[in-house]
Amino acid sequence: MVQRISLKNKLLPDLVEIQRDSFKWFLLEGLTEVLEFFPNISDPTSRLELQLFGKEYKIKFPRYSVRQAKSRDRTYSAQIYVPAKLTRKDIDLPSKDQNKTIKSLDLSSNHLQFSAEKQIKNKKYKKRLVFIGDLPIMTNRGTFIVSGTERVIINQIIRSPGIYYKQDIDKNGKQIYSASLISNRGSWLKFEIDPKGEIWIRIDKTHKVNAYIFLRAIGLNKNEIQKGLSKYAFLISASQSYSVKELAKEIGKNDIEEVTDEEALLIVYSKLRPNEPATVPVAKQMLYSRFFDPKRYDLGEVGRYKINKKLGLNIPKTFRVLSPQDILSSIDYLINIKDKNSGNLDDIDHLGNRRVRSVGELLQNQFRVGLNRLERIIRERMMICDIDSLSLSNLINPKPLIASVREFFGSSQLSQFMDQTNPVAELTHKRRISALGPGGFNKDRAGFAVRDLHPSHYGRICPIETPEGPNAGLIGSLATCARVNIFGFIETPFYPVHNGQVDYSNNPIYLTADEEDDFRVAPGDVKVNVQNYIEGDIIPVRYRQEFVTTIPNQVDYIAISPIQVISAATSLIPFLEHDDANRALMGSNMQRQAVPLLYPEKPIIGTGLETKIARDSGMVVISRTSGCVNYVSANKIGIQDNNGRTVLYRLKKYYRSNQDTCINQRPIVWVGEKIVVGQTLADGASTDCGEIALGRNILVAYMPWEGYNYEDAFLISERLVYEDVYTSIHIEKYEVECRQTKLGPEEITREIPNVSDHSLKDLDRNGIVVCGSWVEAGDILVGKITPKGEADQLPEGKLLRAIFGEKARDVRDTSLRLPNAAKGRVVNVRVFTRQKGDELPPGTNAMIRVYVAQKRKIQVGDKMAGRHGNKGIISRILPKQDMPYLCDGTPVDIVLNPLGVPSRMNVGQVFECLLGLAGGYLDKRFKIIPFDEMYGAEASRALVNRKLQEASILTKNKWIFNDQHPGKMQVFDGRTGEPFDNPVTIGRAYMLKLVHLVDDKIHARSTGPYSLVTQQPLGGRAQHGGQRLGEMEVWALEAFGAAYTLQELLTVKSDDMQARNEALNAIVKGKPIPKPGTPESFKVLMRELQSLGLDIAVHKLKLFENGQRRTVEVDLMSDSKEDRVARSNYEVLPVDDFEQFLY
């Protein structure tokens, strides 16, 4: 078994190869293919011809390194140059003498005629390299740097081009057979047999044409159709109804077999373009451009392969447009399904019918769009510009291609801001597979069938890892051992089995979902003996999408490992088989949210993939050479190789990630140490000795404690705070621009008006905060002043200023200050100016960026979780002496609610914590591969009990393992010293601190900004907004009859502007708060109704001096609150006025 496991570890591919291989394909083949397809362009007079030589394209070395691109907000890209040739053809018209010569010549010779009429002199120019655009280059970690931020292009899973047959039932319960011919680019064709038995062809889902008419239109004669169809009579009989009803109207014939090619073409054209006059050449051209023109229609290599395979054709894979044979064979297959019940229907959710488009293909499609735009611009320039003045430089404009690529990387749904919270998040993001995006599904319309698990997902797409919510099932993750082949289909490895014996001698065989269908495949947790024979009489296998059983001799293949079914993040969960799938899903997703800790610790209980994931994520530094360490510091490591050369490795120190977490690399080698190729030299964020370390091993107790762990809340010890067990560093970025305004430039300065010296204590002489300073909320980071407007200045003042210069101009303080609820240490200050050669936006003279690091200890309100979906919020931090303690006096670190286990069915956490306890006492770490039942029934329980017994014997502490209740022990109350009534489950669990920190969420507002229109307080923490009082809250107050509280909340505390100011004055002066007035939102409602033409106003009853009560209109818009005499609601216009109103 040891040999088999070591073999399997070698079989895990590089987990980021899907990104790197795809981009490599794009550079070697994809870009060449799309450039080669660029046509030779001539002007209308054929005097000028442009030719691109795509195969010889060159890429210039990137202008900036990866580090420079990140720090300067640039794109890490290379310039693409393509050799191009512009050929001019000077055409001389024939002279009179030449005309005489022509008449005496034999006019039948076209060649002589042509050569005499025109004399063409070609001016040949040398090929010149022309710049056509920038291409963002992938970093060695599989990411792109675009405008200084790290982005990832996620993989898209879409319907594969090809032909798919399906059977539906219409509203009357009758069967409809149809076939969809999907192209990579161009129109879709659908063949269908309706309930009446008629065969139709739909073009782009709308236009319906009779199948026989369409076959004639594409150039097939009657004999060819007869030969190509095994059931020709079925086609003719199916068209009888059409012949009688419609054919007579269209061309005046009753027999469909009498239709000529030209008539068929005109019928098809009239269906597609009903309002345009039809002619045969136009119809022919239209049909050609729709299905047979390589520029507009493309099946792709995959589509051609799938159609050939389905219909049994031998058309070359380079022929990527439709052929008449394809259409004829498609109809023949459809008739056979309907008439003979032969042939197979297709399942569109089967992974054999869905393919993955990775970064290379997505980029290729975007380049194709950009080159099409470029072609159109070149043609326009050739038509408009003077031919003699045209040259390569002003003919080929790189802007369309640059814009197309920028649009893709900047705004495509598949180009995403990389999740850099920790290495697992980073790796998972690169291996993500999305069914959304252009050409994919819409999450609002995607049904259950698309999202559901499919048997073909086994070993290809993880059944566990997917988001919760609207994207569930539409976004998945590639399984650990899966890879994508050249056609984009996902493959997974299997060992062949011969007569019940597994062949481990050769490399495993990779199979796609289609190829796997015809074999009996056993899972990876089937027991195999020393001679490599499968043990057991009945073996569970997958065969033709079904889960069945068979005998060992009939097994064709066996999976290489139990973990090949699941993704990289899920494979980090020990005892996964004991967890409910929903909780495992949460565990996988929450590992990606774990914050890198200041002191990371590798787990006692792992799965064996921790090192592999840490290495492939690119977070740790790997040695490229063998040799000896000759230099180590916090910033770099020097390795002297066998040739005596020193290779330096620079380490990342306190870098800010995309999610504001801290990336810091620490050396783990020492001077004089011998190094081999591939050895880990330095740890990064969330790694410990080259292994993933997302959290800490802490002592847990499953017991209730004074109700503080109600509803999954956690009770933790002060030790976790004081010993910085869960302390993390977060780095925030603050930036300010110094702009050129109409009134003059803004200035970065220490001389800020109306600011005390104490506020300037951390600024240098230029007004920028000194690196290393401690700053709190409201402190000035960068001093900046902006010129004020001079509208209120007298003319003589302006004249004096113009004469004597700007001595005492008015300025406004616009300094960059640290926002509310933030504090920390300034770790870096970067100044960008044009003088230094930095590229800045137009109108900006300088930009200053300040990085502030914050040390966050764990506190009440922070979210923690285990690896099994057991998440909760910290409800209280207890002193160490009050925590429950063990028999040897050790206080526990965290108290969890035992009620969180049975209903959630994530028992894996209990196995993990008990084995972790044994590991802690034995000073051992365990690697547990999931699905261990092949080693015997209840293997997990047996292992845990055995190791607890060993720990009990080794430490001579009998209380560690109790036969009466294994895994439980007596625990004492820290406050009283009394033992608790019942034994408690105690263990050492691996707990994570998640990125949902209370510091980022807690928020309060006294005064703050208001909305311009409604004058209500803004919402949200970022806007320093207020707490929303919604309709349900109003109902609650109404239920208690709290009328005055409601009035206050809806007016003074919300949008009654006048009452707001009056209330503030009253509070300041100690007077009673006046009555509220009309809310601003009511006035907005009135104006909206009036804008709709409704005569609406507010009236009140008023008692006049003569004792009469009359309604008076209230003018809400004026502050004076004057009353106006009420108008009649319905004023009748006189006839003259009415006519004047109309005209």
Swiss-Prot record:
GO terms for biological process: DNA-templated transcription. Disulfide bonds: none annotated. SUPFAM superfamilies: beta and beta-prime subunits of DNA dependent RNA-polymerase. The keyword Nucleotidyltransferase applies. It is an enzyme of class 2 (transferase). It is found in: Plastid, Chloroplast. The keyword Chloroplast applies. It comes from the Eukaryota. PANTHER family: DNA-DIRECTED RNA POLYMERASE I SUBUNIT 2. In plastids the minimal PEP RNA polymerase catalytic core is composed of four subunits: alpha, beta, beta', and beta''. When a (nuclear-encoded) sigma factor is associated with the core the holoenzyme is formed, which can initiate transcription. This is DNA-directed RNA polymerase subunit beta. It comes from Porphyra purpurea (Red seaweed). The gene is rpoB.
